Amino acid sequence: WRVIYVEGGPFSDYQRIFQGLALGLEERGLIENGHVPLPKDSEEARGMWEWLHQHAGGKRLVFLADGFYSANWDSQQREKVRQEVLRRIREKKDVDMVLAFGTWAGQDLAAQDLPVPVIVSSVTNAVDAGIIPSVEDSGRDNLVAPIEPDRFKRQVLLFHDIFAFQKLGIAYEDT
């Protein structure tokens, strides 16, 4: 399977999720080496992609050398990336699977009728973002967008189990 990576822009959470994905692929025998190092002092995942291209090994998955796409949080670049990825999948036909990291990438690829699997990761709420229609079903046989509706409730309960707090304050930025 020839794989590409698409993101809206660099984000440190993508690195950790991508690293966990690589380790899971190794654990399941899909690649030989999933021990991709996290970049220091950077939120970029491109270096991780390049590392996997060179070191993942195995015969099942190929991380395409030119298969890393990022819009760098630029809305004009986002459209260019979307068009380039769609053209590559539909016309060049050298992609068998897409890893879409974040809301932008998930929205841009979920809305398309693509002939390849799309795995969406690191989206706070894929239903609210319009990536999938419901928690029960992505609406497309080739689209996976994991969602955990009670995530924040579970986090607070876990935090309470650990620290047994009596009062809880929440700091947030009203953006």
Predicted regions and their residues:
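Short hydrophobic alpha-helices and adjacent helix-cap/hinge residues
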Residues: 1-175
